[in-house]
Amino acid sequence: MAENQNYGTGRRKSSSARVFIKPGSGKITINQRDLDVYFGRETARMIVRQPLELVEMTEKLDLYVTVKGGGISGQAGAIRHGITRALIEYDESLRSVLRAAGFVTRDARQVERKKVGLRKARRRPQFSKR
């Protein structure tokens, strides 16, 4: 690929995203599809754009993303994390701004496992006194 590109890996829940950024016009491609085509939900699109809007580089960089696993929310979060890491590799001075917004930290929350004898992770069967 291009020699003047930066790379970042992002993860959230069970999704993992590989993000490549290079100078361009602001085109975002996810799994060979446009951002608006890939994510139907506006909230997911907003999450993906957040770090770029924060550092005011929406029109300056092209993004090429491959993402696997998880659902819409997890994939959007993974892409955001990957974009943040790629931006830090692109320009280290952006780290403090992105850290203050909370984009640098990996969201470590995972789905809690279902336990034996319970309906879900914590939901107990209904209790009947009589």
UniProtKB/Swiss-Prot annotation:
GO terms for molecular function: RNA binding; structural constituent of ribosome. One of its GO terms (biological process) is translation. Pfam families: Ribosomal_S9 (PF00380). The keyword Lipid metabolism does not apply. Disulfide bonds: none annotated. The keyword Ribosomal protein applies. Keywords: Ribonucleoprotein, Ribosomal protein. One of its GO terms (cellular component) is cytosolic small ribosomal subunit. Belongs to the universal ribosomal protein uS9 family. HAMAP family: Ribosomal_uS9_B. This is Small ribosomal subunit protein uS9. The gene is rpsI.
